[in-house]
Structures are given as C-alpha cells and as structure tokens.
Amino acid sequence: MTFSPEPAYQHGQAPRTAILLVNLGTPDAPTPKAVGRYLKEFLSDPRVVEIPRAAWLPLLYGVILPLRSRASALKYESIWLREAHMTGSPLLVYSERQAHALQRLLHQNGHEVTVACAMRYGNPSIGSVMEALRRQGCEQVLVLPMYPQYSGTTTATAFDEVFRVLGQWRNQPELRLVKHFHDHPAYISALQQQVSAYWARHGMPDFGRGDKLILSFHGVPRRTLELGDPYHCECLKTGRLLGEALGLQPGQYQVTFQSRFGKAEWLQPYTAPTLAELGKVGAGRVDVFCPGFPADCIETLEEIAMEGQTEFKVAGGKDFHFIPCMNDAAPWIAAMAEIALQHLQGWALATPHPHELEARRTRAQARGAAA
C-alpha cells in the first residue's frame, strides 16, 4: 500500500489541536445534477441503507436517482440562501458559522484550537478538511459529529470515514471521538433557551386548551432499534429532558420521527401523520421543534416548516409555528464549547512561548536534524 506524502516536518513548530465538526452533507447546488451526485454518495453508504448491494444498487441507479434528483432539487431550490451575508446551502452556511463562532469563543477564553467543519457526503469532504488540518500541523484532532443522538446511520459512518482517511496517512494524529451528547446538560439548556426565546417573541402555546409542542427527530428504520441501535432511546431521553426543562407536562409535548424513506416500518409515531391528526381534531396551535438538528437544513426548513405546515392546515389545523434550529445562537455555541472542552482535557490548548519553541529546534538541530 502507498501512503499519502507527509508535509515536511519542521522542528520547533508548536503542535496544534483541532476540532472537526461533522454533519451529514448537502449538494453543491440546487440542481438535479448536483443533487443526484450527492444522493448517489449518500444512498450508496451501506450504513445508511442496509440492503444487499446486489439488490439495492440497481434500484438506486435505475429508479431512485432518476426520479428523486429532480424532485429533491426543487426542494433544495426552495430553501437555498441567497442573501448577501448568507449564500448557499443552509446546512453548510450554518455549519461554517458554528465553526467560526466556536473557534472565536474558544480563543477568547485562551484556548488556541482550530475548528473546522466537514460533511460526510458532499463538500467540504472529511478527507479534504482533514488534509487541510494536517497541513496546518494539527497533531491532535477531536471529532465532534453534529448528531446529538448516536446512530449507526449517522455517527458511525462519520467515524468510518475518518478512519478510512487516516488509513492512508503515514503519520496519524492523536484522535478522540465524541459519540453522543443527547443528555448533556449544556445541550439540553441550549435547546430550552432556543424554544423559550421563540416563545418570548411569538407567545407561548395555550397548553390548557390543547395546544401542543412536537419534538420531531429524524427517523430511522425500526429494524435498527431491534438490532441494538440506541438512537430511539436517546431521542426519547432528549425529549423528556427538554420537556422537563421547559416545565411541560408529558401530554403537552410529543416526540415524533420524520423523513421516512421507502416502505419499511420506521420509528414511530411519524411526524407528518401526527400533524395531520392534530389538524383533524381541531388543534388551535402546534409548535414544531427539531432537537436532533443543531443546524437548519432541508429536513427542517422544507419538510417541517413548509410541508409540515401544509399537512397541519389542510387537515383543519389553525396556527402552526416552526421553531428554528439553534444554528449559531450564543447558548448553543457555548454548549458546544463546554462539550468540546470536556473531551479536550489533557491536550495542550495553548502555544508554547517562542523561546521554548526555538530551544526545541536548536536541540534537535544539534543532534543532526535537518530542519
């Protein structure tokens, strides 16, 4: 096996620490071609679709990609950001803003850490971002997937790709992985503050008259639960802790699961039918929040804010409120910093004094080092 070339080593250079934020991914543009390329990579991952390749790939290439690429492109087009200060895929824009804000906060508190974001599918890829970190001299890397609840379909495949990339390196960095943070107090507090801030601006639901808060998480096939994936349990725990933090009674909020794909049974209750049923019974107001998505994306902005609202109102519902994800809100950035710092303990987070670095270089050269 041939390993990728290493950057020239320089004695006297301070080793750097990096945090790699990983999210699912996004197409490069809201076009059928770009969306098709993204979906091909995403749906070809055996962690995502656990069907024998011989049966799945012909269906994917022959039916699903030709049909879904154009339809999905229209959905991406409906949410694509085109503002002067925010242009592109919402998920990528907000992920980059999170990375910049987290690095800024850490630096303000004396922690000299490089923060970068990567996508499991699409760009910027995990491989390209890790290569950039290597070129910057990052010898310690904390991988922090933006999946609060662990799942083999998300967190595990992000780790798989990190390992695959490092398998091509001769000089590998020290590595730490954050498996989940579904019940971390800072995460729950940031969620609570996001919902409370929305209610402070737009008024609270009247739970006494039957209004409801829906906590919608991304769904996965029920089979994964039966095979030992902890995702379902972690979603329920997040929902319970958030409900308690908001001071709600169990009947005032409900955990649901969205984004079902295919005909197999997924985790239930499903979000869309739940919204339709609430509309049918004449619910006055429904608020929907997606705790499992730290950044807004097509699943929140289009599937919930647009399609979900239509489901609810067509069925007879009246007042629909979509509560945006945390994105780069200050409480969430502070929570990210707290989570990261717990996992960074023991690593050097400050650059040694230049005199110390020069002394190291001099000692190495005295022993025959070239640089």
From Swiss-Prot:
On whether Ligase is a keyword of this UniProt record, the answer is no
- Claim: DNA-binding is one of the keywords in the record: no
**Keywords of the record:** Cytoplasm, Heme biosynthesis, Iron, Lyase, Metal-binding, Porphyrin biosynthesis
Q: Which NCBIfam families match?
A: hemH
Disulfide pairs?
none
Domain of life assignment: Bacteria
> What name is this protein filed under?
Ferrochelatase
Tell me the organism's taxonomic lineage: Bacteria, Pseudomonadati, Pseudomonadota, Betaproteobacteria, Burkholderiales
What is this enzyme's class at the first EC digit? Answer: lyase
Extract the InterPro entries matched here: Ferrochelatase, Ferrochelatase_AS, Ferrochelatase_C, Ferrochelatase_N
Q: Which residues bind Fe cation?
A: 218, 299
Q: Write out the annotated subcellular location.
A: Cytoplasm
UniProt EC number: 4.98.1.1
User: One biological-process term from Gene Ontology?
Assistant: heme biosynthetic process
Q: Which reaction does it catalyse?
A: heme b + 2 H(+) = protoporphyrin IX + Fe(2+)
What does the record give as its pathway?
Porphyrin-containing compound metabolism; protoheme biosynthesis; protoheme from protoporphyrin-IX: step 1/1
A cellular component term from Gene Ontology for this protein is: cytoplasm
Query: Which family does this protein fall into?
Result: Belongs to the ferrochelatase family.
- Report which gene this protein is encoded by: hemH
Q: Which residue spans traverse the membrane?
A: none
Task: Please give the Gene Ontology molecular function terms for this protein.
Answer: ferrochelatase activity; metal ion binding
